[in-house]
């Protein structure tokens, strides 16, 4: 019998990353949530047309929404649908997760930020970070540590030659 070929997609499941969030915030916890999307948005995400660098998550009436996320519509998108690239999108989470997030935001003074957008099978998921803002001196120490690690690696590489 002939063996079946396994279907593997080329590339990564990641659609968009928010590198700025890791620089601006201390990420305490990461949570996965689904997104309520329209058809043209899914097609645009398959092409990788998303930007979440300015996005944030807020709670209203016991539900979570992401704002500031831009999904650029495709050129060949339908003409009868008006595409709003920056619309507020609802996050799909369980009631227990929503209550937990709401409590952490209110009690501990945390904020919610979008960290990454990715495919999980055929569903689009967003990774949310429960975060606390960094002060300027914290950002500077992080940069110094990164520079030192880079310099250390460079010295070790040259020493091994």
From Swiss-Prot:
It is found in: Cytoplasm. It comes from Vibrio parahaemolyticus serotype O3:K6 (strain RIMD 2210633). One of its GO terms (cellular component) is cytosol. This is SsrA-binding protein. Required for rescue of stalled ribosomes mediated by trans-translation. Binds to transfer-messenger RNA (tmRNA), required for stable association of tmRNA with ribosomes. tmRNA and SmpB together mimic tRNA shape, replacing the anticodon stem-loop with SmpB. tmRNA is encoded by the ssrA gene; the 2 termini fold to resemble tRNA(Ala) and it encodes a 'tag peptide', a short internal open reading frame. During trans-translation Ala-aminoacylated tmRNA acts like a tRNA, entering the A-site of stalled ribosomes, displacing the stalled mRNA. Keywords: Cytoplasm, RNA-binding. The keyword Cytoplasm applies. PANTHER family: SSRA-BINDING PROTEIN, TMRNA-BINDING COMPONENT OF TRANS-TRANSLATION TAGGING COMPLEX. Belongs to the SmpB family. GO terms for biological process: trans-translation. The gene is smpB. The keyword Ribonucleoprotein does not apply. It holds the Pfam family SmpB.
